[in-house]
Amino acid sequence: MPVLQVYYPQGSLQGGRKAALAQRLTDVLLMMEGGAKTPGGMAFAAVLFTEVPATDWWVGGRTDATYVAPPGKFLIRVDIPEGYMNRSHKSDVHAAVNKAIVDLTGDPSDPKQGASVLVIVNDVTEGNWGARGRTISLAAIADSVGLAKTGERFKWVRNYFAAKARQFGAAGYPPDTGGLLPSESEAEVRSA
């Protein structure tokens, strides 16, 4: 369900490092999906790498390492369906991605490592995710990866979207605005 994009300096993932990091980050993605190591979960666990030339990556107005902490510049964007993660879950992702990169490219025993590993979690608004040319909801993604809708995690998801439906209704949003789970019916938006 999440997509992870890794931007890294040219030449910093030599040899088997990229493949090793891809595997570690795939493990992070599966952890994010609640351990969904199912065919559906694996199909949604996408890691993309973009190598950036040194002359195209500026920090503090410079392209060298003057303002860069070891193990170097890394920017990771993690796209997740809106409403899937609370603040604690996102903090777990920040820590796990940083650890994977420092473990493979730096010195994990040095507490100063990883300050230049930037991890940004982006919530993709419900209704903006698609596959096979169709819009898919977070509920459909949960079904695909085998995430139970009876557990605490999905209870939080339902509470999040129920509150959002009430907010939309109170603000007078049109019922077909989008951004709500299919189970949050148009009637719920109108009645709020």
Protein language model features and the residues they cover:
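A domain-level signal for the structural core that forms small-molecule/cofactor-binding pockets
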Residues: 1-192
